[in-house]
Amino acid sequence: NLFFRVVTRKGGKETDNSVLNYVKKHEDESGIIYCATKKNVDKMYELLRQYGIEAGHYHAGLSLEERKKNQDDFTYDRIRVMVATNAFGMGIDKSNVRYVLHYNMPQSIEYYYQEAGRAGRDGEEAECVLFFSKQDIMINKRLLEYKSTESIESDPQVRRNDYQKLNRMIDYCETQQC
C-alpha cells in the first residue's frame, strides 16, 4: 500500500516549492515531512505556516512541553502536517498518515524504512517521496562524523558499518530502475 519515489532535488527554493505544492495538494490528509537538521525543520515549518498550513514541528531543540503538545496535536488531528527530525515518530501509531516526505536523505535504508513505514498503517494507499541531492551526502557524512566524536560509537567497526549503511542509501537514491 506504500508507493515510493525519489525526486532529484535541484535547489533550495525549488525543493521548498515542490514540498509546499505537495502539501497543498494533499491539504485534507495527514503527513510527515522529515528533515536531516533542526535548521531545515524550522525553515520548512515556517514556510508552511507562512502559507497558512497548520503544521507542527518536532526536534531535540524544542522544549519537552512543546514537543509533547505538537505530537498530541498531530496524533489527534488538530494539525495535519508534522515537520520533524528523526527524533519524531517513536511510539507514534497514527493510522491515517497518507504521505511521508523526506526533505533530506536519511542516513540508512533502515531509517528510511522505519520513517516511511509511518504512512498507510490503516492499509490504505500512501506515498513516500524522498527529495535527494548530492548535498545530502555531505550533510549525512558530517552527522556521522559528529556522532563518532560525540559518543561511545567511535568504535572503528561501528563507523565502518554506519558508512556502509549510508552508501547503501546513496545507491538506492541514485538507482535509475527498480
Spans of features found by a protein language model:
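Helicase motor core with emphasis on the C-terminal RecA-like subdomain
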Residues: 1-156, 160-164
